[in-house]
From Swiss-Prot:
Peptide chain release factor 1 directs the termination of translation in response to the peptide chain termination codons UAG and UAA. HAMAP family: Rel_fac_1 (MF_00093). Keywords: Cytoplasm, Methylation, Protein biosynthesis. Pfam families: PCRF, RF-1. Methylated by PrmC. Methylation increases the termination efficiency of RF1. Its main location: cytoplasm. Belongs to the prokaryotic/mitochondrial release factor family. One of its GO terms (cellular component) is cytoplasm. This is Peptide chain release factor 1. It comes from Caldicellulosiruptor saccharolyticus (strain ATCC 43494 / DSM 8903 / Tp8T 6331). The modification N5-methylglutamine is found at Q233.
Length: 355
C-alpha cells in the first residue's frame, strides 16, 4: 500500500507543476482535465501525509523511550505513543477506503422512482411522504429537484412519482435508498384505529449521458395520447402525452406532465436511458452479486430495507440493524446519520472483499 501511495503522491506533485504552467493554463480544456485529476488525488495525498506525520511521531517516541527519562516524562511519551498507534490504525483504514476503486456513477445526478406498493391509498400517501423526505434532503444539500412524471391517487398521494435530483455526489449519497420501504401506522382511512403495514418501492438510477447507452430508433415504439390528471381533471385536448416502449427489453416509459409532446418525449427518453443503463448494469452484476451473497443479504430491490414505525417514532434500517428514534426528523430530510452509517457499512464490506 505504501508504494502505491508514494506513486500517487509523485503523480500529484507532477500535476501541481502542470496546472501552474502558463501554457497549460491557456489551454482551458487541458487545464480543466488536469485540475479534475489533481482534485481527485488530493484527499488521498493529504491523508497519506497525515499518515507519514503519525509514523514520524511513533518513531520519535520510540527513540525517546530508549533513552533514560524521568518517570513523569516517560509516562507522557508512552501516552503520546499509544495515541499515535491508535491514530495510525484509523488513518490506515481511511487510506484503504480512499484507495478502493471508485464507483464511476458516484458524481452523477440521480433519477429516483417511487411507487406505491402493498396497501392501496395508504401506500400512495406513504410514497408522497418519501418523495417529500428526499426533496427536503436535497434542499439541505443545495441540490435541485425536478419532477419528471407523476401519477396521483385520490387522496393526493402518489401511485408513482419520478424525479431527478441534480447536485455534486447525489448518486453517491442516495444509491443505497433502492429497495422496499415499509410504514407501520394507523392510516387516515382506518376508522377502527388499527395499525396497518404498507410499502413503497424506491429505485435510484444514475443519470446517463447519450453516449453511455445506445438506443436505436428502430427498437422504439412511440405512441401519443391525451394527457389527463388524477381522476380525469385537466384533460388535454391535444395528444401531448407520450409512451415509449423499448421493444428488445419490454421497458415502457410514459410522460404526460409537460404541456408539449416534444418536452414529454425528451423526459421519457431521459428516463428510458437511465432504466436501460440500470437494466444492462444489473445483468452484468447478477453473476458477481450471486458470489457476494452472505449473511448481510443480497441488496436486491425486492428486499425490505427500512421500516418507518409511527406509533414508536422509530426508523430501522434492516441491512445494518440501525434503529433511530427520530422518525419526524428523518421524514423531514434528516437522513445523513442513516446514509453515513450505510456508506461505512458497505465500504467495510468492500474492504473485506479486496482482502
Amino acid at each position: 500500500m505504501i508504494e502505491k501511495l508514494q506513486v500517487i503522491e509523485e503523480k500529484y506533485l507532477e500535476l501541481e507543476k502542470k496546472i501552474s504552467d502558463p501554457e497549460i493554463i491557456n489551454n482551458n480544456q487541458e487545464w480543466q482535465k488536469l485540475m479534475k485529476e489533481h482534485s481527485n488525488l488530493q484527499p488521498i495525498v493529504e491523508k497519506f501525509r497525515e499518515y507519514k506525520r503519525i509514523i514520524k511521531t511513533i518513531e520519535e517516541a520510540e527513540e525517546l523511550l530508549d533513552t533514560n527519562l524521568d518517570e513523569d516524562f516517560e509516562k507522557l511519551v508512552k501516552e503520546e505513543l499509544n495515541q499515535a498507534k491508535e491514530q495510525k490504525e484509523i488513518v490506515e483504514r481511511e487510506l484503504k477506503i480512499l484507495l478502493l476503486p471508485k464507483d464511476p456513477n458516484d458524481e452523477k445526478n440521480v433519477i429516483m422512482e417511487i411507487r406505491a406498493g402493498a396497501g392501496g391509498e395508504e401506500a400512495a400517501l406513504f410514497a408522497a411522504e418519501l418523495f417529500r423526505m428526499y426533496s427536503r434532503y436535497a434542499e439541505r444539500k443545495n441540490w435541485k429537484v425536478e419532477v419528471m412524471s407523476t401519477s396521483e391517487s385520490d387522496l393526493d398521494g402518489f401511485k408513482e412519482v419520478i424525479f431527478m435530483i441534480s447536485g455534486k455526489g447525489a448518486y453517491s449519497r442516495l444509491k443505497y435508498e433502492s429497495g422496499v420501504h415499509r410504514v407501520q401506522r394507523v392510516p387516515v382511512t382506518e376508522s377502527g384505529g388499527r395499525i396497518h403495514t404498507s410499502t413503497a418501492t424506491v429505485a435510484v438510477l444514475p443519470e446517463v449521458e447519450d453516449v453511455e447507452v445506445e438506443i436505436r430508433e428502430e427498437d422504439l415504439e412511440i405512441e401519443t395520447f391525451r394527457a389527463g390528471g388524477a381522476g380525469g381533471q385537466h384533460v388535454n385536448k391535444t395528444e401531448s402525452a407520450v409512451r415509449i416502449t423499448h421493444k428488445p427489453t419490454g421497458i415502457v416509459v410514459s410522460c404526460q406532465d409537460e404541456r408539449s409532446q416534444h418536452a414529454n418525449r425528451d423526459r421519457a427518453m431521459k428516463i428510458l436511458r437511465a432504466r436501460l443503463y440500470d437494466y444492462y448494469q444489473s445483468l452484468q452484476q447478477k453473476e458477481i452479486e450471486s458470489q457476494r451473497r452472505s449473511q448481510v443479504g443480497t441488496g436486491d430491490r425486492s428486499e425490505r430495507i427500512r421500516t418507518y414505525n409511527f406509533p414508536q417514532g422509530r426508523v430501522t434500517d434492516h441491512r445494518i440493524g440501525l434503529t433511530l428514534y427520530k422518525l419526524e426528523q428523518v421524514l423531514d430530510g434528516d437522513l445523513d446519520e442513516i446514509i453515513d452509517a450505510l456508506i461505512t457499512h458497505f465500504q467495510t464490506e468492500r474492504l473485506k472483499e479486496v482482502g
